[in-house]
Amino acid sequence: MMRGMGNMQGMMKQVQKMQKEMAKAQEALNEKEFIGEATNQLVTATFTGDRTMKDLIIKEDVVDPEDVDMLQDLVIMAVNDALVKIEKETEATLGKYTKGMPGF
């Protein structure tokens, strides 16, 4: 009977260790910056891994009051590019911890 308890304690320690490692990885990911770009860097959007926008740069030559739609499209492209990069990095970084776990 004690043998089973020791095994359970060992598993719990492993789970706690994995949780700490995962929290560390998440924290590092949250601090990392991701830059999304649209068409020759006419618009760039910088986010942190927790999806907080830190910067948005729009080149002057793309600002045309007669074509606001194009500028809006470029901003959307840059933001989406950054978010895709964050998602891929998140999966690569945290996926090893959640692989095979239901609901993750």
From Swiss-Prot:
Molecular function terms, GO-annotated: DNA binding
Subcellular location: Cytoplasm, Nucleoid
GO cellular component terms listed in the entry, alphabetical order: bacterial nucleoid; cytosol
UniProt cross-references to InterPro entries, sorted A to Z: YbaB-like_sf, YbaB/EbfC
Superkingdom of this protein's organism: Bacteria
Keywords from the UniProt entry: Cytoplasm, DNA-binding
Assembly with partners or alone: Homodimer.
Similarity comment text for this entry: Belongs to the YbaB/EbfC family.
Task performed by this protein: Binds to DNA and alters its conformation. May be involved in regulation of gene expression, nucleoid organization and DNA protection.
Protein name per UniProt: Nucleoid-associated protein EF_2780
Organism: Enterococcus faecalis (strain ATCC 700802 / V583)
